[in-house]
From Swiss-Prot:
Pfam families: Rce1-like. GO terms for cellular component: plasma membrane. It is a multi-pass membrane protein. It comes from Lactococcus lactis subsp. lactis (strain IL1403). Keywords: Cell membrane, Membrane, Transmembrane, Transmembrane helix. This is UPF0177 protein YxdF. It is found in: Cell membrane. The keyword Cell membrane applies.
């Protein structure tokens, strides 16, 4: 796995996709990114609640079978794959390569986002939550053409999305309304 990630980075570096990745990192950018991560996790929660309350589907998870495969691996390996390998490789593909290859940025935004959601869900009701998530992650990338920022948001959702949904659900149940 690590060898694959190293090869992906070498190819991306040779093709020039890593140009803006480490420029101008300051406290303002870090707080902006933390806000985006929180916003994304909250949006993920709201979409999940909306989809489940309307009973379009019974659970909001990808139906690609990846969770079955990952479930057989040790937890540390799962976190490594979901938190590092998958976000970095998918962001290089969908944001750096696909988004970066299309000159019309609105078309690039739409194609990159929709392809990301389709690869994760196929043509199913699961598409809606993934499409909204993909729009947010693509927007983060489009702000500075920096795939590391979008990979951080992507990784946060992969690692903390389920926990955030449970935490926010508990929080909203405690509110007196």
């Amino acid at each position: 796995m690590t060898l694959v990630l190293i090869l992906i980075f070498i190819i991306a570096w040779k093709l020039g996709y890593l140009k803006n990745t480490l420029k101008n990192w300051d406290l303002k950018r870090i707080f902006w990114l933390m806000g985006i991560v929180f916003f994304t996790l909250a949006t993920n929660y709201l979409v999940t609640v909306l989809v489940l309350k309307t009973q379009i589907i019974s659970s909001v998870t990808s139906d690609t079978g990846m969770s079955d495969i990952l479930g057989q691996l040790p937890i540390l390996c799962q976190k490594y794959i979901l938190g590092i390998i998958v976000p970095l490789s998918e962001e290089l593909l969908f944001r750096s390569y696909i988004f970066g290859s299309i000159t019309n940025k609105k078309v690039a935004f739409l194609i990159s986002s929709v392809l990301f959601a389709l690869v994760h869900t196929g043509f199913s009701w699961y598409l809606l939550p993934y499409l909204i998530l993909s729009f947010i992650i693509t927007w983060v990338y489009s702000k500075r053409n920096n795939f590391i920022e979008s990979a951080i948001v992507h990784s946060s959702v992969n690692l903390f999305g389920g926990s955030a949904i449970k935490l926010l659900d508990t929080f909203f149940k405690l509110l007196p309304y």
